[in-house]
Amino acid sequence: MKGSRKVYLLFFWLFSVSAMAQINTDRMMLMGRNALYYEDYVLSIRRFNMVISAKPYLSEPYFYRGLAKFYLEDYTGAEEDCGAAIDRNPFLPDNYRLRGLCRINLKRYEEAVSDYVKLLEIEPKDESGWHNMTLCYLQLKEYDKAVECIDRMLGYWPQKAPLYTLKAQAYFAQKDTAAAMASIDRALEINP
């Protein structure tokens, strides 16, 4: 009887410790996000490291740690964390958006384009995704693809004057002055 009582006590003690671990990782996530909000990026990275060591299968702490690293301009580390988050959950668009930004800062535009393509598969009307992909194509001097992206954006947001000026920039780079001037005229019609 005494031995079974010890087994029950041990069972309840282990159960309560594992329940506290659950509460602590949730709390660490909250503390890490709060530190991120208050721009204490080093502290937030520490908090997310604790969550990752306790629950490495979650994607969220990798994303937030990557976001903190991005703000600290550790683009390589942020890209790796976004990749780890994508490995764990490939259906969250923020992971692709952040990894694309990291790759732009690392001047790896082709890889950034592939991230934005995946982002736009998940969220087809993501304005920042379309815009950043267009900028990548401009950096790669693939002006036809940039114009194609801008035309898609204009299909979603036809009254955005900056899109026409961006289109004019692509046309000027192609030395198509007439098309560039037509785009600028359209931008001025929308926003004089």
Label each residue range with its predicted role.
Residues A19-Y64, Y71:
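N-terminal leader/linker segments that initiate helical-solenoid repeat arrays
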Residues N24-D26, S59-E60, P93-D94, E127-S128, ...:
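Helix-start (N-cap) detector for alpha-helical repeat units in TPR-like alpha-solenoids
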Residues Y37-Y38, Y71, N105, Q139-L140, ...:
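Register position in tetratricopeptide repeats
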